[in-house]
Protein backbone atom coordinates (compact mmCIF):
# COMPACT_ATOMS: atom_id res chain seq x y z
CA UNK A 1 0.00 0.00 0.00
CA UNK A 2 2.79 2.43 0.90
CA UNK A 3 4.55 1.86 -2.44
CA UNK A 4 1.32 2.66 -4.31
CA UNK A 5 0.96 5.95 -2.42
CA UNK A 6 4.64 6.90 -2.79
CA UNK A 7 5.07 6.09 -6.52
CA UNK A 8 3.17 9.16 -7.85
CA UNK A 9 5.12 11.43 -5.49
CA UNK A 10 8.44 10.01 -6.73
CA UNK A 11 7.21 10.56 -10.31
CA UNK A 12 6.39 14.18 -9.44
CA UNK A 13 9.82 14.69 -7.83
CA UNK A 14 11.69 13.25 -10.81
CA UNK A 15 9.74 14.57 -13.81
CA UNK A 16 7.43 17.45 -12.86
CA UNK A 17 9.12 19.32 -10.01
CA UNK A 18 12.36 20.07 -11.94
CA UNK A 19 10.35 21.98 -14.58
CA UNK A 20 9.19 24.61 -12.06
CA UNK A 21 11.19 26.88 -9.75
CA UNK A 22 11.37 25.81 -6.10
CA UNK A 23 8.40 27.25 -4.22
CA UNK A 24 7.89 25.10 -1.11
CA UNK A 25 8.08 27.23 2.03
CA UNK A 26 8.88 24.34 4.34
CA UNK A 27 11.81 22.04 5.08
CA UNK A 28 11.61 19.21 4.25
CA UNK A 29 9.79 19.99 1.00
CA UNK A 30 6.13 19.03 0.83
CA UNK A 31 6.81 16.02 -1.40
CA UNK A 32 9.63 14.75 0.85
CA UNK A 33 7.38 15.34 3.89
CA UNK A 34 4.59 13.30 2.30
CA UNK A 35 6.90 10.38 1.52
CA UNK A 36 8.30 10.34 5.06
CA UNK A 37 4.80 10.67 6.56
CA UNK A 38 3.53 7.74 4.47
CA UNK A 39 6.54 5.63 5.49
CA UNK A 40 5.89 6.40 9.18
CA UNK A 41 2.08 6.47 9.30
CA UNK A 42 0.76 4.72 6.17
CA UNK A 43 -2.57 6.05 4.87
CA UNK A 44 -2.76 8.53 7.76
CA UNK A 45 0.61 9.84 6.57
CA UNK A 46 -0.92 10.47 3.16
CA UNK A 47 -3.56 12.63 4.85
CA UNK A 48 -0.81 14.44 6.76
CA UNK A 49 0.92 15.16 3.44
CA UNK A 50 -2.26 16.54 1.89
CA UNK A 51 -2.76 18.79 4.94
CA UNK A 52 0.85 19.99 4.57
CA UNK A 53 0.35 20.83 0.89
CA UNK A 54 -2.77 22.82 1.77
CA UNK A 55 -0.72 24.79 4.35
CA UNK A 56 2.01 25.64 1.82
CA UNK A 57 0.97 28.98 0.31
CA UNK A 58 2.34 32.54 0.04
CA UNK A 59 0.63 33.73 3.24
CA UNK A 60 2.46 31.33 5.57
CA UNK A 61 5.93 31.83 7.04
CA UNK A 62 7.10 28.25 6.43
CA UNK A 63 10.33 26.98 7.98
CA UNK A 64 11.23 23.70 9.66
CA UNK A 65 8.28 21.30 9.86
CA UNK A 66 9.48 17.70 10.36
CA UNK A 67 7.10 14.74 10.28
CA UNK A 68 5.90 14.15 13.85
CA UNK A 69 6.05 10.72 15.47
CA UNK A 70 2.31 10.82 16.12
CA UNK A 71 -0.56 11.40 13.68
CA UNK A 72 -1.72 15.00 13.43
CA UNK A 73 -3.04 17.24 10.68
CA UNK A 74 -1.52 20.33 12.30
CA UNK A 75 1.92 21.83 11.84
CA UNK A 76 4.64 20.42 14.08
CA UNK A 77 5.42 23.64 15.97
CA UNK A 78 8.56 24.10 18.01
CA UNK A 79 8.42 25.75 21.40
CA UNK A 80 9.51 29.38 21.19
CA UNK A 81 11.80 30.60 23.96
CA UNK A 82 9.98 32.89 26.38
CA UNK A 83 11.10 36.49 26.58
CA UNK A 84 12.24 37.43 30.08
From Swiss-Prot:
GO annotations of cellular component type: plasma membrane
UniProt superkingdom: Bacteria
Record Pfam families: YidD
Keywords from the named record: Cell membrane, Membrane
Predominant localisation class: membrane
UniProt-annotated location(s): Cell membrane
Span list, region Disordered: 63-84
Cystines in this chain: none
UniProt similarity note: Belongs to the UPF0161 family.
HAMAP family documented for this protein: UPF0161_YidD
Protein name: Putative membrane protein insertion efficiency factor
Organism this protein belongs to: Streptococcus mutans serotype c (strain ATCC 700610 / UA159)
Lineage of origin: Bacteria, Bacillati, Bacillota, Bacilli, Lactobacillales
Amino acid sequence: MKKVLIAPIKFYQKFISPIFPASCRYRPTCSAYMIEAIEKHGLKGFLMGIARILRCHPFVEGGEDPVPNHFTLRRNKKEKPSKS
